[in-house]
């Protein structure tokens, strides 16, 4: 999985490519845990994400909980197959998806 970070002012955009699974989710979790304290909005751009496992969902849920305390989070560029997973798991009711 590739993780690209772009920070503009208080907005951190994390673009993901590849698979977010048991092997790769710790890298995303580390990036989120180590983000600057002044970040008030987190944008997860998952246009290039091909697959997400329960471990990946856990990291996204953890990020949402963290951002609820300090700002906001949204998920953008969600493909149909991952949107279906978000719908089945109820994540559509938890996340802001654009």
Predicted segments — roles?
Residues 2-3, 34:
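Short leucine-rich amphipathic alpha-helices used at interfaces
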Residues 3-28:
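STAS-typified acidic loop motif
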Residues 22-94:
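Amphipathic alpha-helical interaction surfaces in cytosolic regulatory modules
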Residues 96-98:
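Short acidic-hydrophobic, aromatic-tinged amphipathic segments that line or gate anion-handling sites
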């Amino acid at each position: 999985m590739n993780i690209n970070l772009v920070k503009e002012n208080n907005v951190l955009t994390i673009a993901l490519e590849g698979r977010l699974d048991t092997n790769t989710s710790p890298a995303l979790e580390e990036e989120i845990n180590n983000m600057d304290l002044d970040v008030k909005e987190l944008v997860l751009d998952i246009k290039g994400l091909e697959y997400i496992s329960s471990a990946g969902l856990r990291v996204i849920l953890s990020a949402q909980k963290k951002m609820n305390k300090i700002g906001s989070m949204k998920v953008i560029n969600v493909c149909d197959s991952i949107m279906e997973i978000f719908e089945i798991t109820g994540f559509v009711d938890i996340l802001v998806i654009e």
